[in-house]
Amino acid sequence: MLIKQGDRLINTRNWSELVKPEQITRDSDPADAMYGKFVCEPLERGYGTTIGNALRRVLLSSLQGAAFVSVKVSGVQHEFTTIPGVLEDVTDIVLNLKQVRLAMDTDEPQFLELSVNKKGAVKAGDIKTNQHVMVLNPDLHIATLTEDLELTFEFEVRMGKGYVPADMHEGLSEEIGLIKLDSSFAPVRKVAYTVEQARVGQMTNYDKLIIEVWTDGSVTPEDAIAYSAKIIKDQISVFINFDERISGESSGNSSGSSDVNENLFKGIDELELSVRATNCLKSANITLVGELVQKSENEMLKTKNFGRKSLDEIKRVLCDMSLDFGMKVDGFEKKYQEWKRKQQNEA
């Protein structure tokens, strides 16, 4: 379908005729908040690797997480020293602290404390958290006290992304005794993907993307993938140099003096859709094709009981009429009323 925008023609077939995934399914325990295996199919040949690699890189590098950025230990001036009565030296303790995984529900820095006074193991679960911060691996070993003594740790927790070296944190105090920490904010620990063949009808030259995601528990695998997809979408949208909500005025399928595709004025009942799809549209108060095409695919998928199968069914019907979702139809109601009057006059 060719659509005129300004002084140029936009060929919507560049994207409208590509096969799109019918569904994304989870092939792992949905109750597991730290591991997810997902299958996305069908994809155009080569798109499995393209999408899988892009998602993997963003998952590992760009998602927000929480981590310690500094620590103060009572009686300690710097990290290259030892603490009497503690088995580990301060350097080893700092390395252990970097492994503590945190979840935080605020962008504001938080300050936590850990105080011990008895001989024994000190673990991450001993950290006194608040309503904004949660320790995700409380069994992580931090230090071992070989005798009874009072020892206090003071931490600053921040949100961030990726890996930030200690000297790159902004706004930290330079006071003696404050130890700046290298921080790994990334909530995704590991990502792996494979690409297999998928079948569409009798054709087997399509891709099936299988992606596995391991997180630290501060974000679910589903949300991690969703955030990454959103990041990619936002970053590449700048390359689109035309109005994505393509106008419903067609250069190739026009009729009448207004050059409007008259299929826009058809009622939903005229499309011979399945009962399920028709009922979903009616429940969303969509009665005309012109109202339908102005909705995006994502908007439609949020409609109650409206799934990918109904979406694909409607897309095929719209395509036969040289229409698609996400079209811009300026002044549709006015055009519809003019068309109705014209039909009445001709009758």
Swiss-Prot record:
Keywords: DNA-directed RNA polymerase, Nucleotidyltransferase, Transcription, Transferase. The keyword ATP-binding does not apply. InterPro entries: DNA-dir_RNA_pol_insert, DNA-dir_RNA_pol_RpoA/D/Rpb3, DNA-dir_RpoA, RBP11-like, RNAP_asu_C, RNApol_insert_sf. It catalyses: RNA(n) + a ribonucleoside 5'-triphosphate = RNA(n+1) + diphosphate. Its EC number is 2.7.7.6. The keyword Transferase applies. SUPFAM superfamilies: C-terminal domain of RNA polymerase alpha subunit, Insert subdomain of RNA polymerase alpha subunit, RBP11-like subunits of RNA polymerase. DNA-dependent RNA polymerase catalyzes the transcription of DNA into RNA using the four ribonucleoside triphosphates as substrates. The N-terminal domain is essential for RNAP assembly and basal transcription, whereas the C-terminal domain is involved in interaction with transcriptional regulators and with upstream promoter elements. Belongs to the RNA polymerase alpha chain family. This is DNA-directed RNA polymerase subunit alpha. It comes from Nitratidesulfovibrio vulgaris (strain DSM 19637 / Miyazaki F).
